[in-house]
Swiss-Prot record:
Organism phylogeny: Bacteria, Pseudomonadati, Pseudomonadota, Gammaproteobacteria, Legionellales
Function field: Binds 23S rRNA and is also seen to make contacts with the A and possibly P site tRNAs.
Keyword rRNA-binding: yes
Cross-referenced SUPFAM superfamilies: Ribosomal protein L16p/L10e
Name of the gene: rplP
Annotated Gene Ontology cellular component terms: cytosolic large ribosomal subunit
Protein name in the entry: Large ribosomal subunit protein uL16
Length: 137
């Protein structure tokens, strides 16, 4: 599963996930993309499950590019522990995703196969997604 190898600080503030994606919102590396249409926190496990689904569906056909990275640590205190005594330990990692952000890209497969692979992967993710094609300018 994806997680940063080293960070300056182990724990983050909670923060808010607002706005729309101004960067990473175009198909850059492949021919087809899976684009987020709402805000969400995607965990490293969800991302890996979606990636495996795509890889299994396209078999050895194309190349998959993951455009997001889970770099935000989410902490949790153990069960039945009173409040106070500092922040809990890191439980898992998430990627904050805004509407318009590209999540996955595929190249080297036909459109029907890519569309089906992305629809199966979108079922594993906690947000609504859209299938997009690369536009040539």
């Amino acid at each position: 599963m994806l997680q940063p190898s080293n960070r300056k600080y182990r724990k983050d503030f909670k923060g808010r996930n607002r706005g729309i994606a101004s960067r990473g919102n175009r198909v850059s590396f492949g021919e087809f993309g899976l684009k987020a249409t709402e805000c969400a926190r995607i965990t490293a496990r969800q991302l890996e499950a979606a990636r495996r689904t795509i890889a299994r569906h396209i078999k050895r056909g194309g190349k998959i590019t993951i455009r997001i990275f889970p770099d935000k640590p989410i902490t949790k205190k153990p069960l039945e522990v009173r409040q106070g005594k500092g922040k809990g330990s890191v439980e898992y990692w998430v990627a904050l995703v805004q509407p318009g952000r590209m999540i996955f890209e595929i190249e080297g497969v036909d459109e029907a196969l890519a569309r089906e692979a992305f629809s199966r992967a979108a079922a594993k993710l906690p947000l609504k997604c859209l299938f997009v094609k690369r536009t040539v300018m």
